[in-house]
């Protein structure tokens, strides 16, 4: 059942308490948008193939989480999910040495942090010289 249960903080500003939205359908706006806040949408699927289909149909791909005890399943899903970061059996901790960025319309298709970010500021040039 889909419930909208956002209760706002009494502090000045726009704050939302942590909220779960259960029973989402793939075509609902909340299931199709990136929400940056303490919000978790729950969209139940029957199997891995349906989960990959739902993830692939999204126009965003910043982050996904996989929870399983089967390491082969974890690798298969992590390789197949169209996201910039995949967490397996954990949440994303992040580290300045690891690249951060998304796929599709999540981010600028570049990576912040890590050598990928440094390389985006460089231009590689190859020069061949015949010296006689």
Predicted regions and their residues:
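Conserved small/polar residues in nucleotide/adenosyl-binding loops
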Residues: 1-5
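Conserved C-terminal structural/oligomerization subdomain of aldehyde/semialdehyde dehydrogenase
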Residues: 8, 15-132
